[in-house]
């Protein structure tokens, strides 16, 4: 069975973009974007509903995290595509326990490269998500268990000068 997660992320991004520009609800905006292959795949639909549901339910909280880490940027000044990529990745980081944080961040970067109008968008998305992820990790708000879900690499020891 094929995995459609990237395609689903792209469809959700398109739905969020539509929502910003048109007077419609998010379910309608997302519904007409789904392909027959996604609709026929129960695992794909489960992921779609989980991710979209978490974005809808937690958008205010997600936006607060983004706003807190976009210094000197008002949320209204962030490009619509970039803002919605950040929202989607944040929903994955916070509420999709089976997706490693690095995967969520990498997917956001790749989608930014594909959909954003400037080359700097992927760097912007990467920087913001990295800062938010590090803050969430420090606060103990990333609750992912299982192999590969959290990087347990110990921090490097500070280099000492051997000439003392």
From Swiss-Prot:
Swiss-Prot/TrEMBL GO biological process terms: DNA-templated transcription termination; transcription antitermination
Top-rank lineage group of the source organism: Bacteria
GO-annotated molecular function: RNA binding
Cellular component, GO annotation: cytosol
Region called Disordered, residue ranges: 144-164
Gene3D superfamilies: NusB-like
Keywords assigned by UniProt, alphabetized: RNA-binding, Transcription, Transcription antitermination, Transcription regulation
Ranges of compositional bias, category Basic and acidic residues: 149-164
Functional summary from the UniProt entry: Involved in transcription antitermination. Required for transcription of ribosomal RNA (rRNA) genes. Binds specifically to the boxA antiterminator sequence of the ribosomal RNA (rrn) operons.
PANTHER family in UniProt: ANTITERMINATION NUSB DOMAIN-CONTAINING PROTEIN, N UTILIZATION SUBSTANCE PROTEIN B-RELATED
Family: Belongs to the NusB family.
Entry protein name: Transcription antitermination protein NusB
Species name: Chlorobium phaeovibrioides (strain DSM 265 / 1930) (Prosthecochloris vibrioformis (strain DSM 265))
Lineage: Bacteria, Pseudomonadati, Chlorobiota, Chlorobiia, Chlorobiales
